[in-house]
């Protein structure tokens, strides 16, 4: 068995341990990884860093967590070490690093090597662009502009790689998630980012002193552990949490979540009725009571008359009752039932 196949096998075992929340035997696997001669290509193709980072986040064994941190630190050093110090490629890499630093949040430092695969994918494109630009410079003066446009397109498309988080749609969250909150699934990472933006819908989240990214990650993890997939049911569940947390007419829900009065596990399972504001609950209750009162109107004991014409069947075979639904000085409400088609209506 080749080294790459062995790493893939270990990564799969670690992911299963995290999914089952049983990390027994993880220490032996991490020791095997520690003795392996790792390369950048193996880190990229096997994505072993993501699996080890998952164990680090979910394992309670201090020895396992410590060894996982050592592995991640060593691999990150390996990923950061190569790079051309001079020339055109060196300048382009420095520009890319400056752009990435501008996107980073001020309150976290990257721990796992999750972003370097994106850099390596950009390197072949950069090489091709530089070679093409050199060859085109000797052939005709018009070609360099075309190559520059192609290079700009490749740079614009680079954020779409699987290793980079999707751009959030909310203007209130402009920074990317910290690597420790990434799941390796682009759909889940996007949902965590949107939940975090919903928790930051108002500046008062700073008063609670909570890490919104961490809280959003916990909410998403509870939803995912319950549904076990990222299908439409999962997305609808996340979407309903976001809309209710961002509702300006229901600020109490978001504040209760930020303060801890509503836990991440509870908000992940609450129904739309449970998340609704007090005003909306009262309105729904009033509508329910009105509907019950209308449908509980007795069919027997009413007065049969031909004074009312049904709007559906146009017949005049009806039964009506008069009930005092409002205050005593208000007129009574007349409830009419068509004996032919069962149509009901009321008027005052």
From Swiss-Prot:
Record carries keyword Zinc-finger: yes
PROSITE patterns: TFIIS_CENTRAL (PS51321), TFIIS_N (PS51319), ZF_TFIIS_1 (PS00466), ZF_TFIIS_2 (PS51133)
Entries under CDD domains matching the protein: TFIIS_I, Zn-ribbon_TFIIS
InterPro entries: TF_IIS-typ, TFIIS/CRSP70_N_sub, TFIIS/LEDGF_dom_sf, TFIIS_cen_dom, TFIIS_cen_dom_sf, TFIIS_N, TFSII, Znf_TFIIS
One Gene Ontology term of the molecular function aspect: zinc ion binding
Pfam families reported for this sequence: Med26, TFIIS_M, Zn_ribbon_TFIIS
Zinc finger (TFIIS-type): 306-346
Start and end residues of each TFIIS central domain: 187-303
Native organism taxonomy: Eukaryota, Metazoa, Chordata, Craniata, Vertebrata
Compositional bias (Low complexity): 133-143
Domain of life: Eukaryota
Cellular location(s): Nucleus
Modified sites of kind Phosphoserine: 115, 140
GO cellular component, one term: nucleus
Binding locations of Zn(2+): 310, 313, 338, 341
Residue stretches of biased makeup (Basic and acidic residues): 86-110, 120-132
Function: Necessary for efficient RNA polymerase II transcription elongation past template-encoded arresting sites. The arresting sites in DNA have the property of trapping a certain fraction of elongating RNA polymerases that pass through, resulting in locked ternary complexes. Cleavage of the nascent transcript by S-II allows the resumption of elongation from the new 3'-terminus.
Region (Disordered): 78-166
A biological process term (GO) from this entry: regulation of transcription by RNA polymerase II
Keywords: DNA-binding, Metal-binding, Nucleus, Phosphoprotein, Transcription, Transcription regulation, Zinc, Zinc-finger
Gene3D superfamilies: 2.20.25.10, Conserved domain common to transcription factors TFIIS, elongin A, CRSP70, Transcription elongation factor S-II, central domain
Domain spans labelled TFIIS N-terminal: 5-82
Presence of the UniProt keyword DNA repair in the record: no
Protein's gene: TCEA3
Name of the protein: Transcription elongation factor A protein 3
Alphabetical list of NCBIfam families matching this protein: TFSII
């Amino acid at each position: 068995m080749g080294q790459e196949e062995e790493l893939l096998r270990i990564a799969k075992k670690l992911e299963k341990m995290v999914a089952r929340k049983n990390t027994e035997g993880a220490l032996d696997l991490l020791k095997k990884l520690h003795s392996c001669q790792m390369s950048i290509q193996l880190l990229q193709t096997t994505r072993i860093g993501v699996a080890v980072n998952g164990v680090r986040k979910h394992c309670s064994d201090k020895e396992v967590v410590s060894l996982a941190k050592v592995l991640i630190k060593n691999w990150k050093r390996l990923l950061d070490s190569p790079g051309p110090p001079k020339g055109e490629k060196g300048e382009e890499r420095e520009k890319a690093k400056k752009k990435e630093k501008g996107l980073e949040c001020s309150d976290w430092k990257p721990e796992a090597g999750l972003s370097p695969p994106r850099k390596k994918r950009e390197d072949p494109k950069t090489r091709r662009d530089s070679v093409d630009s050199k060859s085109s410079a000797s052939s005709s003066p018009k070609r360099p502009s075309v190559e520059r446009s192609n290079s700009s397109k490749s740079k614009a498309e680079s954020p779409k790689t699987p290793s980079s988080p999707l751009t959030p749609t909310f203007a209130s969250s402009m920074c990317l998630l910290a690597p420790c909150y990434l799941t390796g699934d682009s759909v889940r990472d996007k949902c965590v980012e949107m939940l975090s933006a919903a928790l930051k819908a108002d500046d008062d989240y700073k008063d609670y002193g909570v890490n919104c990214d961490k809280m959003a990650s916990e909410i998403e993890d509870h939803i995912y552990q319950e549904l076990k997939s990222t299908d439409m049911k999962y997305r609808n569940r996340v979407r309903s949490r976001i809309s209710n947390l961002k509702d300006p007419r229901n600020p109490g829900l978001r504040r209760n979540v930020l303060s801890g009065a509503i836990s991440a596990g509870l908000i992940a399972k609450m129904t739309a009725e449970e998340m609704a504001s007090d005003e909306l609950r009262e309105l729904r209750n009033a509508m329910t009571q009105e509907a019950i009162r209308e449908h509980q109107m007795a069919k027997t004991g009413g007065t049969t008359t031909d004074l009312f014409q049904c709007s559906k069947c146009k017949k005049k075979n009806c039964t009506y009752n008069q009930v005092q639904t409002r205050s005593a000085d208000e007129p009574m409400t007349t409830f009419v039932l068509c004996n032919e088609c069962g149509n009901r209506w009321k008027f005052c």
